[in-house]
Amino acid sequence: MFRSTWNFLKRHKKKCIFLGTVLGGVYILGKYGQKKIREIQEREAAEYIAQARRQYHFESNQRTCNMTVLSMLPTLREALMQQLNSESLTALLKTRPSNKLEIWEDLKIISFTRSIVAVYSTCMLVVLLRVQLNIIGGYIYLDNAAVGKNGTTVLAPPDVQQQYLSSIQHLLGDGLTELITVIKQAVQKILGSVSLKHSLSLLDLEQKLKEIRDLVEQHKSSSWINNDGSKSLLCHYMMPDEETPLAVQACGLSPRDVTTIKLLNETRDMLESPDFSTVLNTCLSRGFSRLLDNMAEFFRPTEQDLQHGNSINSLSSVSLPLAKIIPIINGQIHSVCSETPSHFVQDLLMMEQVKDFAANVYEAFSTPQQLEK
């Protein structure tokens, strides 16, 4: 039997060699295919885990953003109430001074200015912190992902994070003071000549706020000018110009300072982007809409209006003398800058445009390939 098998193999030698080669190739290809499939599965699993880890870190970062905004609102409110102290004027009016009319005029300007600045600065705080914390969050994610790898340099050490995030103080300090000046001038121009006895409906009030916004957002600034000569919307209130104390030092910059300047420049690039401008404008529109909603409660028709059959759905059906509107607008700062989640702040924090923008910023700074560009 062995001899017959051997003779068969000798007679079909070439065929057997070919068959053996084919079977061997199939076996090798099968092993290679299994190895590649296993590698692909392992890579996909690693990518899925990395993506899940990054998504978890992103969501945690957004919660941090929200808590940071809420924690900073009392500081913002205190700064506004200190620089625009309407309470002292109100107390003065109770003493029945001889210049009562003059004090009322001052109270009119300060009350409107305070609430309008509160809307602007709160919207700026929400969007600016979204940018800053997602930039630094992206760096922290990359640092955490690189833990244990040889030759890796920490991108954002804690001291750099602290130095970078302290730049928010510009919005709460010099930026806020400049914003107050600009808005106060706009309020004076639009409402300065309006009599305290003049009645305004909610629709009239909306138009006045629009006129004030137009003046504020067209205000010229020596810095933050785009290449085409147009002004970047409101950016200089959120960050100082590029001549920062760190940047102007001729020598002696530490590695920490260099990294911080890099982060600030990246933030400045984000603030100058069309996406940032769009998101901020959307927040401002929502903010002023919510401000009017809050005030609408005081423009409800009276029993007499209802008896006369006046339309209760019209924004112009109820009017109030400006003197009665002043205390209403004056008190809005406590709703706008409330550290307890109010409808005003919640609306801003939960806006889809803000969430999408935050995701894009985080994506850009948590991806090594994007960061190297």
Swiss-Prot record:
UniProt keyword terms in alphabetical order: Membrane, Peroxisome, Peroxisome biogenesis, Transmembrane, Transmembrane helix
Residue ranges, Cytoplasmic side: 1-15, 141-373
GO annotation terms (biological process): protein import into peroxisome membrane
| Region called Interaction with PEX19, residue ranges | 120-136
Localization (cell): Peroxisome membrane
Annotated transmembrane regions:
16-36, 117-140
Record membrane topology: Multi-pass membrane protein
Where is it found, in Gene Ontology cellular component terms? peroxisomal membrane
Chief location category: membrane
InterPro entries in the record, alphabetically? Peroxin-3
Enumerate the GO terms in the molecular function aspect. Answer: protein-macromolecule adaptor activity
Q: Where is this region: Targeting to peroxisomes?
A: 1-45
Q: Which domain of life is it from?
A: Eukaryota
Tell me which parts of the chain lie in the Peroxisomal compartment: 37-116
What job does the chain carry out?
Involved in peroxisome biosynthesis and integrity. Assembles membrane vesicles before the matrix proteins are translocated. As a docking factor for PEX19, is necessary for the import of peroxisomal membrane proteins in the peroxisomes.
Subunit text: Interacts with PEX19.
Family designation: Belongs to the peroxin-3 family.
Can you name this protein?
Peroxisomal biogenesis factor 3
Q: What organism is recorded for this protein?
A: Bos taurus (Bovine)
Query: Source taxonomy lineage?
Result: Eukaryota, Metazoa, Chordata, Craniata, Vertebrata
